Amino acid sequence: MNIRADHVTVFVARPDASSTSHAFLQLRRAASDYLGGTWQLIRGCMEPGETAVAAALREMREESGLTAQELYSLGPVETFYLWPTDTLVHSICFCAIVEPASQIILNPEHDDFRWIPRHDLDAQLMWASERRLVPEICRDILDNGIAKPRLLVQL
C-alpha cells in the first residue's frame, strides 16, 4: 500500500446576495478527466517544497481563477482510499472565503461550475469524508465560532 500526505482540499465559500448566508463552489470534472462528470471541490497535490497553504491557494487560482479573501485551516484531515493504486490519501483541508462578485475562470480539468447554497451543501457532496467537514465549517467559520480566529491562516 502507498500512503500519501501531499493533497489539499479547499471548500470555497462566498457570501450570498443578502450577506446572511454563504454558497459553496463546486466544479464539474471534464468528461475526459478522472471522475469525469462529477461535481467536486477544489483539490490537488502539493508540489515539491510547497506548503499546504501555498498549494491550496495555487490550486484555487489554477482550477477556478479565484483568490482567497480569507483562508481557514480545518482541524480534521480528509482521509480516503484509492483502490486502483492501492493508495491511502491524507488531504489537508481548508475553507476559503472569496468576494461575492468573484469571476470563475475554469481550467481544462473542469467544464462547469455551480454555487450551492449552504443549506444544500451536504446533499451535493459526493464523498462522506467531505460531508463530515460541513458542520465544522458552518459552526466554526461561517457562524463565527470561538475557534474561528485560531483557524485563520495569515496570508
Describe every region a protein language model picked out:
Residues 34-38, 103-155:
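Nudix hydrolase/Nudix homology domain
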Residues 20-62:
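Conserved Nudix-box catalytic region and its N-terminal flanking loop in Nudix hydrolases
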